[in-house]
Every structure is written in structure tokens, then in C-alpha cells.
């Protein structure tokens, strides 16, 4: 006698720790393509929601793909809830977004989650651009972050250029960087970690990161590795979140995450690889 297949609706949903909402590439190590392996290294289950799906990053001679259609994107988010997968989610992680409409949709979706789970972590890397390239996201993204997403963030990881874009304040010195970061603390926001903070002030061969909270500001310093693959910010954000979920204080989590990125950069340089090679076991 053939047994009937169990009704999926009667089975327990897959427990999800992290909803990671960012880019996805077929080839390369950026967005969720690098974040998911990092999260998995911490033993975390991830629902990876793509914002754009690309063959590779735009710095290659050819690229295919684009932003996920908005109705698909909203459907991905809605169906996570419909499957009952969000009950135990510990953090929502945001990276590269495909445009302001996605930011607005995300704002509504996250606000609904936070209304039910006021303690839910929302970690946002407000991807806008950098000092070398300028703005490389869709027009209107700065305003979209300000209007729809920053009020929901518990933590932010802008680089110095993005901090300046979001606040409209100078960030040339470390003091200015810390002051600008503090203007983003309010409401839900507990910390801002500024990567590539005040680069004009760095000693030769060093890189600085500012970790800013309501009560404290620490400047971390690490070696500069002479290679520049894409995806280091995405890797840092995932590693940071992993260490925070493991119970580390924010400054220590940032230090450990930076160390993981440095190890990956050193491995990448030694291999002569054009894409980021993930480092070894977690520390």
C-alpha cells in the first residue's frame, strides 16, 4: 500500500536565523554569494533574498542580468512569512539594493516585522558608493535609505563616503567621522561602524575603522593588504553579524570580522586571484 505524502502545511517550517537581502552573482564573491558561506560558517541558517541577479560584477568586460522585478521581490518577502519561516529570525541583513522601490518595499516589510518583534536586529550596509568610484547605485537611493530604512536599523556599516552621503557632513578627520556617525544614532540605532574611516589620516600601510555607539567611540586599525577584490564589505558585514549573534560586544565583533577579511585578502593576494577567497576556520 502506497502511503500518502505528508501535507507540507502540517510540517514544521525550516528554522531561519538570518534573512540576508542583497545582490547575487553567478560568478564572483559579492553580496549573498559571499555572505551566505560566511553565515554558514557560524552555523547560521540563511534565507538569501536577491535584489539583483547578475552574471558577475560590472567591472568585467561583459555582464548580464539586472534588478529583480519588484513583484517578485515583494513576493519573496511575503512568502517567507507565509511559510512560517520568520518566527525565529534573529537578524535581517541588508546589502546592495536594486533601486528605491525595493528600499520602500523593504521598509514596509521590516516595519511589519519590528512591530511584532521589537527586539529584531536589522543590520544595514547602506551601499551607495565610495571615494574612488563615486555613487554607483540607482538615482534616489540616498533619499530612499534616509526615508525608508535608516529609522529601522539597529546597526549600520557605511564606508566614509556613504556616511558623508547619508549625513551631509564632512568626514575628512576621525573626529568629523565620529561626529557624523553619531547623528545616525537614535530611535532603534545602537551602533555605526564606519569602514575605511577618514583615509587621509591613516598611517602608511594601515586602515582604520571607527566603531561608534551612544556612549563610546573606538578606532580599530589593521594592515592594508595590497589587493582589491570586490565583496570585502559584504564579507565584513556577514562576519560582523555572525560574531554579534555569537555574543561578542560590537567593537570585538568588528575586530574579529576585520581579521577574517584581512585573512581572506591575504589568501587572495597570495593566490593571485581576481575574486575574494574566503579565509580558513573562524576565530
From Swiss-Prot:
B6-vitamer kinase involved in the salvage pathway of pyridoxal 5'-phosphate (PLP). Catalyzes the phosphorylation of pyridoxine (PN), pyridoxal (PL), and pyridoxamine (PM), forming their respective 5'-phosphorylated esters, i.e. PNP, PLP and PMP. Pathway: Cofactor metabolism; pyridoxal 5'-phosphate salvage; pyridoxal 5'-phosphate from pyridoxal: step 1/1; Cofactor metabolism; pyridoxal 5'-phosphate salvage; pyridoxine 5'-phosphate from pyridoxine: step 1/1; Cofactor metabolism; pyridoxal 5'-phosphate salvage; pyridoxamine 5'-phosphate from pyridoxamine: step 1/1. Coiled coil: none annotated. This is Pyridoxine/pyridoxal/pyridoxamine kinase. Its cofactor is Mg(2+). Its EC number is 2.7.1.35. InterPro entries: PdxK, PM/HMP-P_kinase-1, PyrdxlKinase, Ribokinase-like. ATP binds at residues 125, 157, 162, 195, 222-225, 232. CDD domains: pyridoxal_pyridoxamine_kinase. HAMAP family: PdxK. Belongs to the pyridoxine kinase family. PdxK subfamily. Homodimer. It is an enzyme of class 2 (transferase). One of its GO terms (cellular component) is cytosol. Substrate binds at residues 23, 59, 234. GO terms for biological process: pyridoxal 5'-phosphate salvage. One of its GO terms (molecular function) is zinc ion binding.
